[in-house]
A protein has these predicted regions:
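Extreme N-terminal starter segment of soluble prokaryotic enzymes
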Residues: 1-4
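Short Gly/Pro-enriched turn/cap motifs at secondary-structure boundaries
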Residues: 9, 20-21, 54-60, 110-114
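Conserved hydrophobic/aromatic beta-strand scaffold that supports enzyme active sites
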Residues: 16, 64-66, 121-123, 129, ...
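Cysteine-cluster motifs in flexible loop/terminal segments that predominantly coordinate metals
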Residues: 76, 85-133
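Mid-domain Rossmann-like dinucleotide-binding core that forms the NAD(H)/NADP(H) cofactor-binding site
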Residues: 135-190
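Cytochrome P450 core scaffold surrounding the K-helix E-X-X-R motif
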Residues: 41-43
């Protein structure tokens, strides 16, 4: 499928071009991108300050999407609204088998290590799509960032009557503050 795409060719330079999207591989789905969040990672890549990044790259890992087609068995159907888990890991790796997919040696992040969603459609593993019928596309573009905040709070083990310190009030810091409310007596923000 031929489609337009936005490519960050080098720090500070985007271009639009056309690219070909292959048919979905087995156990992949084609999704239509409806919303894209702009992340701090994207901004750092634009300014040339993202150490895990190679140019050229199609950015976009905070995505709200709709299923177009599926190549394999799935609980999802074309037309369904989905949240996209942008961390592409080997499900059979030792780290993934232990529930630590973020430590998988072959981990790739959409829009960082491989091309992401700044184009109309992409193919992703079916297992990385999560049905989200009650969410808006705008909300879905925030899911990945909110998950990072929730994960940070879960790992912190903070609880009443402890005080929590949050360093920074960017989007992730704000999500941490949101998830800490009701879980700790006091939140200090610096």
């Amino acid at each position: 499928m031929d489609q337009p795409q936005i490519i960050l060719t080098e720090p500070g330079r985007f271009i639009t071009s056309r690219g070909t999207l292959p048919d979905p591989a087995p156990e992949e789905a084609r999704i239509r991108i409806r919303r894209i969040g702009v992340c701090g990672t994207d901004i750092h890549a634009f300014h040339g300050r993202q150490p895990f990044f190679e140019y050229p790259r199609i950015l976009g890992h905070e995505l709200g999407a709709e299923v177009v087609s599926i190549n394999g068995d799935s609980h999802l159907k074309p037309g369904e609204v989905v949240a996209v888990e942008p961390y592409l890991n080997d499900a059979n790796s030792p780290a993934s088998q232990k529930g630590k997919s973020n430590c998988c040696e072959s981990l790739r992040v959409l829009g960082v290590h491989c091309d992401g969603g700044m184009r109309p459609e992409i193919n992703v593993p079916i297992r990385k799509l999560h049905r989200a019928a009650s969410a808006t596309m705008d909300q879905l573009a925030l899911v990945e960032m909110l998950c990072i905040g929730q994960h940070a709070v879960n790992r912190s083990l903070v609880s009443f009557p402890e005080t929590a310190l949050v360093l920074g009030t960017g989007p992730i810091g704000l999500s941490v503050i949101t998830f800490l409310k009701g879980q700790t007596k006091r939140i200090v923000v610096a």
